[in-house]
Protein backbone atom coordinates (compact mmCIF):
# COMPACT_ATOMS: atom_id res chain seq x y z
CA UNK A 1 0.00 0.00 0.00
CA UNK A 2 1.46 3.38 -1.05
CA UNK A 3 1.58 6.33 1.34
CA UNK A 4 -0.34 8.54 -1.09
CA UNK A 5 -3.17 5.99 -1.01
CA UNK A 6 -3.19 6.15 2.78
CA UNK A 7 -3.53 9.92 2.63
CA UNK A 8 -6.69 9.57 0.57
CA UNK A 9 -8.36 8.15 3.66
CA UNK A 10 -10.67 10.72 5.24
CA UNK A 11 -10.30 9.29 8.74
CA UNK A 12 -7.63 11.33 10.52
CA UNK A 13 -6.87 8.63 13.11
CA UNK A 14 -6.32 6.02 10.39
CA UNK A 15 -4.03 8.38 8.50
CA UNK A 16 -1.88 8.95 11.58
CA UNK A 17 -1.74 5.22 12.32
CA UNK A 18 -0.70 4.35 8.77
CA UNK A 19 1.88 7.13 8.56
CA UNK A 20 3.68 5.46 11.46
CA UNK A 21 3.82 2.23 9.42
CA UNK A 22 5.80 4.10 6.74
CA UNK A 23 8.42 5.22 9.25
CA UNK A 24 6.79 8.54 9.96
CA UNK A 25 5.80 10.08 13.25
CA UNK A 26 2.27 11.05 14.28
CA UNK A 27 3.67 14.22 15.84
CA UNK A 28 4.98 15.28 12.42
CA UNK A 29 1.55 14.87 10.92
CA UNK A 30 -0.10 16.82 13.73
CA UNK A 31 2.48 19.60 13.49
CA UNK A 32 1.91 19.93 9.75
CA UNK A 33 -1.85 19.94 10.23
CA UNK A 34 -1.67 22.69 12.86
CA UNK A 35 0.55 24.80 10.59
CA UNK A 36 -1.91 24.37 7.75
CA UNK A 37 -4.88 25.29 9.93
CA UNK A 38 -3.10 28.45 11.13
CA UNK A 39 -2.84 29.96 7.63
CA UNK A 40 -6.20 31.85 7.70
CA UNK A 41 -5.31 33.41 11.06
CA UNK A 42 -1.84 34.42 9.85
CA UNK A 43 -3.36 36.06 6.78
CA UNK A 44 -5.96 37.84 8.92
CA UNK A 45 -3.50 39.21 11.48
CA UNK A 46 -0.54 40.13 9.25
CA UNK A 47 0.25 43.84 9.64
CA UNK A 48 -1.85 44.20 12.81
CA UNK A 49 -0.65 45.39 16.21
CA UNK A 50 -1.17 43.24 19.30
CA UNK A 51 -0.69 44.57 22.84
CA UNK A 52 0.37 41.71 25.08
CA UNK A 53 0.41 42.13 28.85
CA UNK A 54 2.94 39.68 30.26
CA UNK A 55 3.11 38.64 33.90
CA UNK A 56 2.23 36.04 36.47
CA UNK A 57 3.33 32.41 36.20
CA UNK A 58 4.51 32.84 32.61
CA UNK A 59 7.14 35.24 33.94
CA UNK A 60 8.23 33.30 37.04
CA UNK A 61 8.68 29.90 35.34
CA UNK A 62 11.87 29.99 33.23
CA UNK A 63 10.68 27.49 30.63
CA UNK A 64 7.38 29.34 30.20
CA UNK A 65 9.33 32.60 29.90
CA UNK A 66 11.48 31.13 27.14
CA UNK A 67 8.37 29.82 25.36
CA UNK A 68 6.82 33.27 25.57
CA UNK A 69 9.93 34.91 24.09
CA UNK A 70 9.96 32.47 21.17
CA UNK A 71 6.26 33.08 20.54
CA UNK A 72 6.79 36.86 20.46
CA UNK A 73 9.59 36.47 17.90
CA UNK A 74 7.37 34.19 15.82
CA UNK A 75 4.59 36.80 15.80
CA UNK A 76 7.04 39.41 14.51
CA UNK A 77 8.30 37.04 11.81
CA UNK A 78 4.71 36.48 10.68
CA UNK A 79 4.22 40.20 10.08
CA UNK A 80 2.39 40.93 13.33
CA UNK A 81 3.57 43.83 15.50
CA UNK A 82 3.68 42.66 19.14
CA UNK A 83 4.13 45.22 21.90
CA UNK A 84 4.87 43.69 25.30
CA UNK A 85 3.83 45.40 28.53
CA UNK A 86 5.01 43.60 31.64
CA UNK A 87 4.31 43.52 35.33
CA UNK A 88 6.54 42.07 38.00
CA UNK A 89 4.59 42.04 41.24
CA UNK A 90 6.17 38.88 42.63
CA UNK A 91 9.69 40.21 42.06
CA UNK A 92 8.72 43.53 43.71
CA UNK A 93 7.35 41.59 46.70
CA UNK A 94 10.61 39.67 46.92
CA UNK A 95 12.67 42.86 47.22
CA UNK A 96 10.24 44.53 49.62
CA UNK A 97 10.47 41.51 51.91
CA UNK A 98 14.23 42.02 52.10
CA UNK A 99 13.63 45.37 53.81
CA UNK A 100 10.68 44.01 55.86
CA UNK A 101 8.17 46.19 54.05
CA UNK A 102 4.62 45.02 53.40
CA UNK A 103 2.29 46.26 50.68
CA UNK A 104 -1.36 47.20 50.83
CA UNK A 105 -3.56 46.67 47.78
CA UNK A 106 -6.77 48.49 46.86
CA UNK A 107 -8.78 47.09 43.94
CA UNK A 108 -5.69 45.29 42.70
CA UNK A 109 -3.41 48.36 42.87
CA UNK A 110 -0.38 48.56 45.17
CA UNK A 111 -0.37 51.57 47.53
CA UNK A 112 3.04 53.08 46.77
CA UNK A 113 5.00 55.38 49.08
CA UNK A 114 8.36 56.94 48.14
CA UNK A 115 10.41 54.01 49.43
CA UNK A 116 8.25 51.46 47.64
CA UNK A 117 8.42 53.51 44.44
CA UNK A 118 12.23 53.27 44.42
CA UNK A 119 11.98 49.49 44.66
CA UNK A 120 9.28 49.33 41.98
CA UNK A 121 11.31 51.39 39.50
CA UNK A 122 14.52 49.48 40.18
CA UNK A 123 12.88 46.07 39.83
CA UNK A 124 10.62 46.74 36.85
CA UNK A 125 12.94 48.92 34.77
CA UNK A 126 16.31 47.54 35.83
CA UNK A 127 15.72 43.83 36.36
CA UNK A 128 12.48 42.49 34.90
CA UNK A 129 12.48 44.60 31.74
CA UNK A 130 16.05 43.71 30.83
CA UNK A 131 15.49 40.03 31.49
CA UNK A 132 12.53 39.94 29.09
CA UNK A 133 14.40 41.82 26.36
CA UNK A 134 17.34 39.47 26.75
CA UNK A 135 15.12 36.40 26.37
CA UNK A 136 13.46 37.79 23.23
CA UNK A 137 16.83 38.74 21.73
CA UNK A 138 18.21 35.29 22.54
CA UNK A 139 15.24 33.81 20.67
CA UNK A 140 16.20 35.79 17.56
CA UNK A 141 14.22 39.00 18.01
CA UNK A 142 15.26 42.64 18.32
CA UNK A 143 13.66 43.72 21.58
CA UNK A 144 14.15 47.17 23.07
CA UNK A 145 13.43 47.75 26.75
CA UNK A 146 11.49 50.91 27.57
CA UNK A 147 9.44 52.41 30.36
CA UNK A 148 6.69 55.00 30.28
CA UNK A 149 9.24 57.74 30.98
CA UNK A 150 11.27 57.13 27.82
CA UNK A 151 10.52 59.68 25.08
CA UNK A 152 7.52 60.72 27.20
CA UNK A 153 5.90 57.50 26.03
CA UNK A 154 3.14 57.45 28.65
CA UNK A 155 2.16 60.37 30.85
CA UNK A 156 0.33 59.48 34.05
CA UNK A 157 -1.89 61.26 36.51
CA UNK A 158 -2.26 60.51 40.20
CA UNK A 159 -4.89 57.99 41.29
CA UNK A 160 -7.13 58.72 44.27
CA UNK A 161 -9.95 56.54 45.54
CA UNK A 162 -13.06 57.74 47.31
CA UNK A 163 -14.85 55.48 49.75
CA UNK A 164 -17.57 55.57 52.38
CA UNK A 165 -16.25 54.81 55.85
CA UNK A 166 -19.79 54.31 57.11
CA UNK A 167 -22.47 52.95 54.80
CA UNK A 168 -25.17 54.62 56.92
CA UNK A 169 -24.21 58.07 55.64
CA UNK A 170 -23.11 59.55 52.35
CA UNK A 171 -19.87 61.06 53.59
CA UNK A 172 -17.05 60.08 51.24
CA UNK A 173 -13.37 60.05 52.15
CA UNK A 174 -10.37 60.14 49.86
CA UNK A 175 -7.77 57.37 50.07
CA UNK A 176 -4.31 58.57 49.08
CA UNK A 177 -2.64 55.79 47.07
CA UNK A 178 0.73 57.53 47.14
CA UNK A 179 2.69 57.44 43.90
CA UNK A 180 0.12 55.38 42.03
CA UNK A 181 -0.90 56.69 38.65
CA UNK A 182 -3.08 55.86 35.70
CA UNK A 183 -2.35 56.50 32.01
CA UNK A 184 -3.38 59.98 30.93
CA UNK A 185 -1.74 60.44 27.55
CA UNK A 186 0.20 58.19 25.16
CA UNK A 187 2.87 59.48 22.77
CA UNK A 188 2.47 57.09 19.84
CA UNK A 189 5.28 58.43 17.61
CA UNK A 190 7.97 56.09 18.92
CA UNK A 191 5.71 53.03 18.78
CA UNK A 192 4.49 53.80 15.26
CA UNK A 193 8.15 54.01 14.22
CA UNK A 194 8.83 50.61 15.76
CA UNK A 195 5.84 49.10 13.97
CA UNK A 196 7.63 49.84 10.70
CA UNK A 197 10.89 48.33 11.93
CA UNK A 198 12.18 45.00 13.21
CA UNK A 199 12.14 46.20 16.82
CA UNK A 200 9.89 44.72 19.50
CA UNK A 201 9.05 47.19 22.31
CA UNK A 202 9.06 45.79 25.85
CA UNK A 203 7.54 48.35 28.21
CA UNK A 204 7.76 48.65 32.00
CA UNK A 205 4.77 50.47 33.57
CA UNK A 206 6.73 53.21 35.33
CA UNK A 207 5.62 56.61 34.06
CA UNK A 208 6.14 60.31 34.69
CA UNK A 209 3.46 62.86 35.45
CA UNK A 210 2.93 66.43 36.56
CA UNK A 211 5.86 68.20 38.25
CA UNK A 212 8.20 65.46 36.97
CA UNK A 213 6.87 62.99 39.54
CA UNK A 214 7.27 59.27 38.90
CA UNK A 215 4.26 56.97 39.17
CA UNK A 216 3.78 53.25 39.56
CA UNK A 217 1.08 52.37 37.03
CA UNK A 218 -0.71 49.03 36.84
CA UNK A 219 0.55 47.11 33.80
CA UNK A 220 -2.97 46.10 32.76
CA UNK A 221 -3.98 49.77 32.58
CA UNK A 222 -0.88 50.65 30.56
CA UNK A 223 -1.60 47.83 28.12
CA UNK A 224 -5.17 49.05 27.69
CA UNK A 225 -4.08 52.65 27.12
CA UNK A 226 -1.64 51.53 24.43
CA UNK A 227 -4.28 49.34 22.78
CA UNK A 228 -6.65 52.30 22.53
CA UNK A 229 -4.01 54.80 21.41
CA UNK A 230 -2.66 52.51 18.69
CA UNK A 231 -6.04 51.08 17.65
CA UNK A 232 -4.59 47.62 18.24
CA UNK A 233 -6.38 44.62 16.78
CA UNK A 234 -6.03 42.67 20.02
CA UNK A 235 -5.31 43.17 23.69
CA UNK A 236 -4.13 39.95 25.31
CA UNK A 237 -3.58 39.69 29.07
CA UNK A 238 -1.69 36.70 30.46
CA UNK A 239 -2.57 35.80 34.03
CA UNK A 240 -2.32 33.03 36.64
CA UNK A 241 -5.86 31.70 36.27
CA UNK A 242 -7.77 30.03 33.41
CA UNK A 243 -9.72 33.23 32.75
CA UNK A 244 -12.80 34.99 34.13
CA UNK A 245 -15.10 32.81 36.21
CA UNK A 246 -18.69 33.14 37.36
CA UNK A 247 -20.01 33.01 40.93
CA UNK A 248 -19.70 29.20 40.90
CA UNK A 249 -16.12 29.25 39.67
CA UNK A 250 -16.99 28.14 36.14
CA UNK A 251 -14.81 29.51 33.34
CA UNK A 252 -16.55 31.98 31.03
CA UNK A 253 -15.15 31.59 27.51
CA UNK A 254 -16.95 34.77 26.44
CA UNK A 255 -18.42 37.61 28.45
CA UNK A 256 -20.21 40.82 27.50
CA UNK A 257 -19.21 44.25 28.78
CA UNK A 258 -22.37 44.50 30.88
CA UNK A 259 -21.77 41.10 32.48
CA UNK A 260 -18.13 41.97 33.14
CA UNK A 261 -19.20 45.18 34.87
CA UNK A 262 -21.68 43.19 36.97
CA UNK A 263 -18.94 40.78 38.10
CA UNK A 264 -16.94 43.74 39.41
CA UNK A 265 -19.92 45.44 41.07
CA UNK A 266 -20.99 42.22 42.81
CA UNK A 267 -17.47 41.47 44.03
CA UNK A 268 -17.27 38.20 42.07
CA UNK A 269 -14.26 39.59 40.21
CA UNK A 270 -11.84 40.90 42.79
CA UNK A 271 -8.22 41.74 43.54
CA UNK A 272 -6.01 41.63 40.44
CA UNK A 273 -8.87 40.63 38.15
CA UNK A 274 -10.51 44.05 38.62
CA UNK A 275 -7.98 46.14 36.62
CA UNK A 276 -7.81 43.39 34.00
CA UNK A 277 -11.55 43.44 33.41
CA UNK A 278 -11.72 47.23 33.61
CA UNK A 279 -9.03 47.45 30.95
CA UNK A 280 -10.74 44.95 28.65
CA UNK A 281 -14.07 46.75 29.06
CA UNK A 282 -12.57 50.09 28.08
CA UNK A 283 -10.77 48.64 25.06
CA UNK A 284 -13.78 46.89 23.54
CA UNK A 285 -16.04 49.87 24.27
CA UNK A 286 -13.74 51.97 22.10
CA UNK A 287 -14.45 49.46 19.34
CA UNK A 288 -10.87 49.07 18.16
CA UNK A 289 -10.36 45.34 18.69
CA UNK A 290 -10.94 42.34 20.90
CA UNK A 291 -9.71 41.73 24.44
CA UNK A 292 -8.62 38.40 25.88
CA UNK A 293 -7.66 37.18 29.35
CA UNK A 294 -5.74 33.90 29.04
CA UNK A 295 -3.90 31.41 31.24
CA UNK A 296 -0.17 32.16 31.13
CA UNK A 297 0.59 28.82 32.82
CA UNK A 298 -0.13 26.98 29.55
CA UNK A 299 2.96 26.55 27.33
CA UNK A 300 2.68 28.56 24.08
CA UNK A 301 -0.74 29.83 25.12
CA UNK A 302 -0.38 32.82 22.77
CA UNK A 303 -0.12 30.56 19.74
CA UNK A 304 -3.03 28.44 20.91
CA UNK A 305 -5.20 31.52 21.34
CA UNK A 306 -4.27 33.18 18.07
CA UNK A 307 -3.70 30.43 15.54
CA UNK A 308 -5.98 27.52 16.45
CA UNK A 309 -9.72 27.02 16.74
CA UNK A 310 -9.17 26.00 20.36
CA UNK A 311 -9.20 29.40 22.03
CA UNK A 312 -8.28 29.62 25.70
CA UNK A 313 -9.36 31.84 28.55
CA UNK A 314 -12.03 34.54 28.26
CA UNK A 315 -12.86 36.96 25.45
CA UNK A 316 -14.60 40.21 26.45
CA UNK A 317 -17.15 41.35 23.85
CA UNK A 318 -19.01 44.61 23.39
CA UNK A 319 -22.25 42.75 22.72
CA UNK A 320 -24.84 40.85 24.71
CA UNK A 321 -24.21 37.11 24.83
UniProtKB/Swiss-Prot annotation:
Coiled coil: none annotated. Its main location: cytoplasm. It is an enzyme of class 2 (transferase). The keyword Cell wall biogenesis/degradation does not apply. GO terms for cellular component: cytoplasm. Its EC number is 2.7.2.8. Substrate binds at residues 88-89, 110, 216. Catalyzes the ATP-dependent phosphorylation of N-acetyl-L-glutamate. Belongs to the acetylglutamate kinase family. ArgB subfamily. NCBIfam families: argB. This is Acetylglutamate kinase.
Amino acid sequence: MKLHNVLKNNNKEDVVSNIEQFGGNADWFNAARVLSESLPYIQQFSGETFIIKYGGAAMKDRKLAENFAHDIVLLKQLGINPIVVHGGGSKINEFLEKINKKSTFVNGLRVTDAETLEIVEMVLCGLVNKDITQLINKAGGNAIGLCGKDANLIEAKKVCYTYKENQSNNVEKILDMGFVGEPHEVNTDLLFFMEESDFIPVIAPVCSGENDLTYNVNADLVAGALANALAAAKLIILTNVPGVTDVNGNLLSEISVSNAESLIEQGIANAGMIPKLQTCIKVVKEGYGSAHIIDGRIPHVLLLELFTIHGTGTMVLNTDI
